[in-house]
C-alpha cells in the first residue's frame, strides 16, 4: 500500500493553471499533489553572444526553491553566493527538454527564459517544472503570435515529465516525498506528446533493478505522460 493510498499507476491530483502572472508573457501554476511550482516565460530580444547572427533563437531555464518550500528553511542560494549542483542540473534538464520540441529557427533571433520557482516541495519538483514549463512556453508563444512576432509552428510537440519508482517491491507512478525517500529505485522520464523519449534519469537506491523492472517503469511513465499531455492541451485550449 502506498502512503497516499493511490493505485500503483495513479497520478497525484494534477492542475495546470495558465496565465497566472500579470507581467509575464507566459505563465503557469502547476500542482502535482502538494508540489506546487510557479513557472513564467519571459521574451527577451537578445541572445547569448555565441548565437548572434545565426538566424535562430534560444530557450533557456532557471530553477529555484523558496526558502520554506521544504519542511525546514533552506537558505537562499543568492545569500550563499552560488547555486548548488542540484539546481544547475535541474535547470539544464528543463532547458534541454523544452528545446527538444521547439523550432528555434521559427522563433527568430530572440530568447525565451523560463523561470521555475518551487513554492512547495513534496517530491517531483523537476517533473512538475517541465510539465508546467511547456504550458508557460505555449502561453508566451501564443502572446507572440497575436502580435505577429512569429509565424508557423514553433512548438513541434508537447513535452511532459513524470517520476516512477519501485516502492516496497512494486513499480509505482509519480512518487511523492514519502515514497521517494524510501524507494528502492527511482527514475524520471521526460517524453514528447507522441511518446518519444527526451531524457531518462534512473537510480537504484538500494538494490539494482532488472531490465523487466525498468520496462515496467517506462510503461507507467508513458501512461502518466499521456495523461499530463491531455491536461496541458486543456490548459492552453
Swiss-Prot record:
Assigned EC number: 2.7.7.56
Binding site for phosphate: 86, 124-126
Alphabetically ordered keywords of this record: Nucleotidyltransferase, RNA-binding, rRNA processing, Transferase, tRNA processing, tRNA-binding
GO molecular function: 3'-5'-RNA exonuclease activity; tRNA binding; tRNA nucleotidyltransferase activity
Entries under Pfam families matching the protein: RNase_PH, RNase_PH_C
Transmembrane segments annotated in the record for this chain: none
Catalytic activity entry: tRNA(n+1) + phosphate = tRNA(n) + a ribonucleoside 5'-diphosphate
Gene3D superfamilies: GHMP Kinase, N-terminal domain
GO biological process entries: rRNA catabolic process; rRNA processing; tRNA processing
Described function: Phosphorolytic 3'-5' exoribonuclease that plays an important role in tRNA 3'-end maturation. Removes nucleotide residues following the 3'-CCA terminus of tRNAs; can also add nucleotides to the ends of RNA molecules by using nucleoside diphosphates as substrates, but this may not be physiologically important. Probably plays a role in initiation of 16S rRNA degradation (leading to ribosome degradation) during starvation.
Subunit: Homohexameric ring arranged as a trimer of dimers.
Family statement: Belongs to the RNase PH family.
Record-given protein name: Ribonuclease PH
Amino acid at each position: 500500500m502506498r502512503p497516499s493510498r493511490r493505485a500503483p499507476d495513479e497520478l497525484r491530483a494534477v492542475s495546470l493553471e495558465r496565465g497566472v502572472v500579470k507581467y509575464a508573457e507566459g505563465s503557469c501554476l502547476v500542482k502535482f499533489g502538494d508540489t506546487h511550482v510557479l513557472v513564467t516565460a519571459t521574451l527577451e530580444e537578445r541572445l547569448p553572444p555565441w548565437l548572434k547572427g545565426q538566424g535562430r533563437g534560444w530557450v533557456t531555464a532557471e530553477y529555484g526553491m523558496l526558502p520554506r518550500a521544504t519542511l525546514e528553511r533552506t537558505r537562499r542560494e543568492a545569500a550563499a553566493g552560488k547555486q548548488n549542483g542540484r539546481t544547475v542540473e535541474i535547470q539544464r534538464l528543463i532547458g534541454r527538454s523544452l528545446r527538444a520540441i521547439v523550432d528555434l529557427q521559427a522563433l527568430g533571433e530572440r530568447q525565451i527564459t523560463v523561470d521555475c520557482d518551487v513554492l512547495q516541495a513534496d517530491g517531483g519538483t523537476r517533473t512538475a517544472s517541465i510539465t508546467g514549463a511547456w504550458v508557460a512556453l505555449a502561453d508566451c508563444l501564443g502572446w507572440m503570435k497575436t502580435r505577429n512576432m512569429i509565424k508557423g509552428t514553433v512548438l513541434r510537440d508537447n513535452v511532459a515529465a513524470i517520476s516512477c519508482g519501485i516502492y516496497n517491491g512494486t513499480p509505482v507512478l509519480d512518487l511523492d516525498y514519502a515514497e521517494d525517500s524510501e524507494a528502492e529505485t527511482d527514475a524520471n522520464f521526460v517524453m514528447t506528446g507522441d511518446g518519444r523519449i527526451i531524457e531518462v534519469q534512473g537510480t537504484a537506491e538500494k538494490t539494482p533493478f532488472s531490465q523487466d523492472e525498468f520496462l515496467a517503469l517506462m510503461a507507467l511513465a508513458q501512461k502518466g505522460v499521456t495523461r499530463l499531455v491531455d491536461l496541458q492541451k486543456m490548459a492552453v485550449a
